[in-house]
Amino acid sequence: MFDYNQLNKLKDKIQSSDGLQIKDRTYLYKTYRSVFVGYECVDWIFGNCPDIKTREDAIKLGQTLFDAGIICNVTSGADPIFKDDYIFYQFDNNKNNNNINNNNNNATSTATTATAPITPVSTKIGSIGKSSSKSSTAVDKMNNNNNNNNNNNNNNNNNNNNNSNNSNSNNNSSRRTSSVPPPVLVTASLSSSTSSSSSSTTSTSSSLASTNTNSNSTYNSNSFNKKHHRYSINELSKVVLEDLNTVTLVKDELIQLSQELMNGDKGLKLQKKKKGAAGTTISCFSGSQLIDWLVKKLEVTRKESIQIASALMHLNIFIEVGTIFNSSNNNNNNNNGGGGVMSSTLSTTIPSSISLQQLSNQSQSNSNSSSSSSILNLSFTAPISISSTTATMSSSLSLSTTAATTTTTTTSSSLLNNSSSGSGFLVPTLPASVLNSSSNSNNQLYSSSPLSLSTSSIPAFDNRIVEDCGNVFYEFLTKPEAIINHVAMRRLDDLCLTHKCISIIPTTIINTSKFLRIIDLSFNQLSESNQLESIATLYNLESCNLSHNQLSTLPSSFSRLELLTKLILSHNCFQVIPNVVFQLSNLEELSLAANQLSSISESIGSLKSLEKLDLSFNKQINKIPKELGLLVRLKSLNVLGSNKINELPSFLSTLPLLEQLDFSRDIIKSPPKEITSKGFTHIIGYLKDLFEGTETLSHIKLMVLGSEKTGRSSLVKALTKSQTKSLSRQSANFLKKVTSSEVSLNDPIEIIQLKLDLPPEQQNGIMTSSSNLNLSTGTLPPPTQLSSSTSELKPQRKDSFGSSMTTPEKKRPTKRNVKLMIYDFRMPSIDVYYHTHQFFLSERAFYLVTYDINKDLSHSGLEFWVESIKKKAPNAPIYIVATHIDTFNQYGGDILVPLNEIDQYLTQRSLEVTGVIGVSSTTLRNIDLLKNEIIQTLLNQSNNNNNNNNNNNYNNNKQSNSISTTNWLNERIPSIYITLETNLQEEAKKRPIVTWDEYQNIAKLSNFTTSSYEKLVRATNTLNRWGSIIWFEDSKSSLKDFVILDPQWFSDCFYKLLLAKHSFINSDGILLLSNLKNIWKPNIVPEQFHIKLLKLLERYQILYTLKNNSNLQQLQQQQQQQKSFGNLSKENSLNSMSYSIESRSSSSPLPTVVTLSAEISSSPSLSLSNSSQSVFTNPNNNNNNKSEQQQQQQQQQQQPQPISTSPKLLRNSLKNLKSIENNSSSLSNNSILNSNSNSSGNLLQNGSYISFNRIIIPCLLPNGKPSHLASLWDTWSGEDEHQIGRYYQFRNISAKNCFERVMVRFLYMMEPIVYWSTGILFRKTQTYRENIKDSMSSCGTLVEFDTVTQQLQIRVRGHEFDACAKLFQIVLENVDTILKDYQINQSQTYIPCSCSCECRDLPHLFPIDLIEETFGKGESHTKCPITMKLVSLCKISPDITLSSVSSNKKVSKEDLIYQEEIGVGGFSRVYKGIYKNNTVAIKQFNFERMDLIDSTSFNNLNSLTISPSNSSLSISLSSSTSSLSPPIVNNNNNNNNLNNNLNNLNNNNKLYIQQQQQTQQNQQQQQQQQQQQQQQQQQQQQQQQQQQQQQQQQQQQNQQQPKILQRNLSTSSLSSNSSQGEDSMNQISSGKLNAINEFRREVWLMSGLSHSNIVLMKGFCFEPYAIVMEYMDIGSLSSFLKKKKEDGQVLDWQMLLKIVTDIASGMAFLHNITPPLVHRDLKSPNILLASHPTNPNEISAKVSDFGLSRSIVQNFSSKVVDNPTWQSPEVLKGMEYNEKSDIYSFGMILWECYHLELPFDEFDFKFMSTLEDNILSGLRPSINQNCNRMYSSLITKCWNADPNLRPSFNSILKTLNEIKDSTINSK
């Protein structure tokens, strides 16, 4: 049915993030990772494969996937058959699944059954539930019912007291004295209800089923008595999961366990025994035999096994046949068995035709000699109630729609007598706990009141337990007839016949009609309605489960089931909802999931009592009828997987009790994803907004984007030819006053109105014939083009209820048109256009991206524009418009060739667009065709899921699913939103920016009240997505405190910054914060908004802020003093741009860079002037009066000069500069102090704190490499120079932003030599203590971003290898922090070879995984395939081999002597040991458990050798949600666009052009050299790696498109003979590698730390991975304080001060090193204590565990610890944080040391999330009133919510010393 290519596509789709949901699940106390359930897979296939029409076809396709090895069983042992059942499967990612044609029938088998009905997922799931706590539970209802019936049963209970007492006394000597509590089955409702949860055999505990799903237990956890195993009847109902001694399993687990139990080969071995007088032989097993099997199978204790076995017995899996007695013991047996209950053997000894009446008559004839007995039937959601029947069995059943009566079985005394007279019957007795309970004359125990019915079909069960002994035997019940008879005999109210292969229901089921309330017939073979007639006789039935059958209709007799409240019909063949269902007026839960329904009947409104409706995975349902709004009691609605329901009707907001919605988020278009992603409350709120009134938008935006000179404006003119043009001056507030002739040139955005005629709308739909379109007839015949579908589609208009609107009948069709507002961007600067166009993008816009068909695709910028649009509007239609086809002369003028090239270009980069079309704006060729495509795309939006088979269309399955929008022509928008937008547009003419308070006042004019805050937030977010305003709902910053009403005003603000390039911004792209007020004049931008606008520009990644340091003032000094030192020779001088001279002490921190994240307190309400009266004024430019020659000279002075290529001369020049540095710093010392009196920050007038004083604008940096870069870099190109490098391969072009953050960090952390827009060359600043020859300052580092290969390339060169290795480690540390904090994913990491000078320039790239593998094997070298030389791993990867750490720190395992274990961590164990005759602590890492973190294996790359020159490297690029960087812009074009405003740049551009030409020549030469080396390389590969290349070719044939996985592996000459399956690296998980990297980081960090209060690392070991540290004999501070508390002792005040002072001293050292180190996990368990060797009473404290520590160069944003006890509020919020977070943690330690308790333990929070919420709300531990005042004040300061108000550790040490002195003085 599916060919090879289709299976490959299906495999990719089902395994994608939007495919089948996989998660960790528990089955029989074992957790399985990344698994799914069989029926989930069938549901997904049925819902997502259009060709699959039935579930049978879906099962067959699942079997095909199973046979192909794409999916496999979790465990081994079962038949390799794919089942639509509760079976666990997983994706077989550990095998090579490329060859799908080879059936893998030997895949690992035996499925493990799902433990619960897990939520099946089609694509992205929207499971929305409203959290609410219910005060009234089933337990409360049952207790009330019991109390009401106590008096009615008082007499009956008193009559039975004597019998009960006798039973109790006789049972005192009984063998049944087990203290094990009765089994408890606990279930909970799933938060995400689906077809499976409704249609499964039971609704089970999701907490047991999945570790990822929260559940709400039915029981109260506080009522469980954990000290005793015997309970009263009421206590039994309150047993909960939290008790470790009580084993609870869900029903599905028990059912599957029973199947394994009855498996002849691996199940229980049965014994042959004789029973009865006739000596009938039966197959049975003993209790101890069963317990032994369970203990071995489940690896649990015997007590737990008894619990599980008892639960199986209560499910009627087996029955007790009792003890076989001899004749001589009859009397004793009779005495011991008095009052016992007849065993369930009756169900096998009586004929199947026996009737309940016959049994009743027999019971009545022996009523005088029989003793009534009670069987406890425990419902899983209600307390136990025992109903005692009289001897005549005359008790009436109390029935209700919501309760079930639990009855007891009264056995015949004649049968009991027979069993006592040697008949051989096996008579069981009741447990003592039951008889003891029954001896109490408690009316409540013997009431006959009904019980609350369970919400699932788990049967009621009593407190019988399986006996763990060898003389009590049990027999399996396998036949349905026997189970029915057993239930009838024991009068149970629950009948479970699941998985019994039933095709006809036995007629004996009528015997259960009087008391049966729950029946489960799921997973059988019922297909005809007449087979269900017998169910209609069960007039007391309340729950019926018929799921997983083949039913298509129900018998009309079902209407008799008047008490039915729950009906499960999921996973059947229903095409319509049976009419009989609508007659069940008491129905509360209805599930029709995974059927073939095509519509929802309007009769659904008749089910007034319905509370839960599941219609999921009926993919033909296209709307929700408005009659559903009549279900006022509805609480849960599930339409998940209904692929044609694309909107949620507004009437759902009127359902008062609705608390849960389940739907497919990628299909639902209204509400939009921005609303649905926020949860249930926001969805209902938006639907309420719609319900109050809706409108359709009057127009649709059509935005024309594209690079410069691609014909954007010409295309707009061609589209609007012969139509009236409507101009819009967007920046009237800012632009200069110009004449009318200048308007068209300077208007930044020209908005033109275009009206297109739509096909006439008729009563039955929309006519889409192309003949009705307003197309020009004079155009040339269109060539074959790539476009969207033009198939005939008929969308319907919807009203607010989601139903089709009735069009008035007319004789002629209605004529319609659509109004498009074309946005033509005419920004005055290319930089402004590239960076600020994103302000105007709208999710409700149509996009045209222009591209000149005559230009090279690689420079088209299509990636940038498509990614930029996708970021703001991921589902908007995008057309690539190839212009200038009239001038295309290649390929004989056939434009099909370049259009196909565009198609391939987009496909290779995974750029998803709607279509590609070629046009000519001059001849108007295909312009009408483009209009037609726009119209058809708008019409087809409501039917965007239809497949298009037109070969000329650029459209595949992936694109058609992802590029899908709502039907904008008919979409209803809340009227209040449109009113607000109109009012804001009027207000924007007066003031373009307002505070949030002012914005709320404006909203009041649009009928937004004070109480409608959430509505205003929804409306504001919607307008922001439309591009009407700019606002960020960001609780982590102050961006939410203001709203920009005019996006063009904000764009002009940025333009003003660019205009100041030569007046206030130097050539380095640096702007002083103090100069900002000279650019943004007060009458243009109020100064109160300056910082906020900078924050917003940084959020868009247009500019970056730089943290305060003295670099800036020194840079200014250097520029001013350059003339004084002008007599220096070129060899001994460095210009201002090359080197930033710094004068710092060795102890001061390095200057740092921080993203604009520091919180600035909100300014008071601002009074803005009327912006319409303010215009831009050009700032004073000092260069305006200079001649062109002077400007050129100044520009040349600013450019870095070439220096000598000799490293020796460079080092000499650096020595000479040292004296200059000292002189320059002394000359202007006073000026520095005056200009930077507050070195740590600036204070605003209102007291707000600013942590930066400079801004860098990357777009102002030169685009091309400096011409003298080669000469600078060649400084370190000698034979004796070393090189260490690392290449990061990224997936998409957004990685450019990653480089910008890296560059900004190194700009002021290091000493830049030269930098440009895509690279930076720097050295580390030299300190006076360093020897320049051996220091890191003698090394050079080049960091570049290759825009062609999307690689971030890092190379460090130097004469001394140790210095290079140390510097390289620092660079990697900072890059790694940026990648993690900003969650930037790179697809692969490479290590460049440096075996020779030639290889250093054009290196072979080793995949890092290969080096990891080689080093893991103990090898020290690898071979370079280019030069065939051996390369030392230590030289190319010092971070992996830790060669940067001193060699005397490396320890061999033989040198270590292990002693006892002293600590255990998550993935490490700490041992006490001996090293060099000294006692040490050995922290040994255990990576065997890393498979629990990440089971992702590594696969091979297709390419062996990857060189940076290989621009044709195939990389699969994916779209990204991060901000994008614009493509490289030619500065010459910039000059043309700036026009008269930037005339002073002309001469500068000439110099740039010259540099670019020279750079291009150098690049051409390099390319030629690269091509020659590539040819040599290819020849070597063909000779030496021929076999491996053949394997790669075979892999390429099996794959359609190359892909980049997370950590790929490439073979080399060392492993060329190894097959892919034998590659040992494939067995290493990425989680393990990450852990190993953290081990290396910790070793590297600790090796450089030396302080008396830092735990000293004495060495490290690779085999095994271990760190040897000094031994701290007392242990952790946490355990020390705990022991003090337990012993009732207090911590001596002097000792307390000594401990906290030691900790503060160690942390002060970390924060003051260069660069500072943030611990990030400071807590009492990570503080180790040791006693003094000579004075045991003296204790020293030391800081340890640096696995999470990071160098603080800029703030962090990632949360690395899950326990919130010691975490600061900014970390919990996910905000950026710095060393101040350690201060907060230290405050908690201060409190902990004084109170000897863990923080927040006093509040007894049960959930970490609750604790986090309270911490964020300001909760802190209570401080004892007797605490020292200064100490208490210090605690409060340290844990202040504002990080800026927390003291530093230097200040803390000073305070602690003052406390110590005050204590001494007080004595």
Curated annotation (Swiss-Prot):
Compositional bias annotation for Low complexity: 121-223, 768-793
Biological process, per Gene Ontology: intracellular signal transduction; signal transduction
SMART domains, alphabetized: DEP, LRR_TYP, S_TKc
Domain COR: 974-1111
Gene3D superfamilies per UniProt: P-loop containing nucleotide triphosphate hydrolases, Phosphorylase Kinase, domain 1, Ribonuclease Inhibitor, Transferase(Phosphotransferase) domain 1, Winged helix-like DNA-binding domain superfamily/Winged helix DNA-binding domain
Signal peptide feature range: none
Residue stretches making up the Protein kinase domain: 1456-1864
UniProt keyword Protein biosynthesis present: no
LRR repeat start-end pairs: 491-512, 515-536, 540-561, 563-584, 586-607, 609-631, 633-656, 657-678
Domain of life: Eukaryota
Keyword terms, alphabetized: ATP-binding, Kinase, Leucine-rich repeat, Nucleotide-binding, Repeat, Serine/threonine-protein kinase, Transferase
Gene Ontology cellular-component annotations: cytoplasm; cytosol
Cystines in this chain: none
Catalytic activity as recorded in UniProt: L-seryl-[protein] + ATP = O-phospho-L-seryl-[protein] + ADP + H(+); L-threonyl-[protein] + ATP = O-phospho-L-threonyl-[protein] + ADP + H(+)
Occurrences of domain DEP (ranges): 16-93, 264-342
Active site, per annotation: D1721 (proton acceptor)
Domain Roc: 693-941
Region annotated Disordered, chain positions: 96-115, 121-225, 763-813, 942-961, 1163-1207, 1509-1546
PANTHER family: SERINE-THREONINE PROTEIN KINASE, SERINE_THREONINE-PROTEIN KINASE ROCO8-RELATED
Recorded family membership: Belongs to the protein kinase superfamily. TKL Ser/Thr protein kinase family. ROCO subfamily.
Protein's UniProt name: Probable serine/threonine-protein kinase roco8
Gene: roco8
